[in-house]
């Protein structure tokens, strides 16, 4: 892939779905190929995924959340995935939307 010649300190990416076993899934095979290559060439992987990704399904596996440096999400995942993140030393950052901040 074209991006195989690139190296990055940080990769900020999202995914189509996160399975209960931590598998990160994507819908498009071409996008999956680019993300997998960049993950392999990045020192830190910052993953952004809202709560809908925990129940979504997609066809192409791009890796496992255990590879991530941090997961930024609006809601914490279920206990099995939380345990995997903890044991893999992935920092989980729960963020709120701007609407919630304005309402409070």
Q: At which residue positions do the language-model features occur?
A:
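Conserved phosphate- and dinucleotide-binding cores of soluble alpha/beta proteins
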Residues: 1-104
């Amino acid at each position: 892939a074209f991006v195989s010649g690139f190296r990055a300190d940080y990769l900020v990416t999202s995914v189509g779905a996160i399975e209960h076993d931590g598998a990160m899934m994507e819908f498009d095979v071409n996008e999956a190929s680019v993300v997998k290559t960049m993950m392999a060439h990045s020192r830190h992987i910052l993953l952004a995924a809202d709560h809908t990704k925990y129940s979504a399904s997609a066809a192409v596996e791009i890796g496992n959340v255990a590879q991530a440096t941090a997961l930024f999400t609006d809601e914490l995942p279920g206990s099995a995935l939380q345990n995997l993140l903890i044991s893999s030393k992935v920092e989980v950052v729960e963020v709120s939307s701007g609407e919630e901040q304005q309402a409070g």
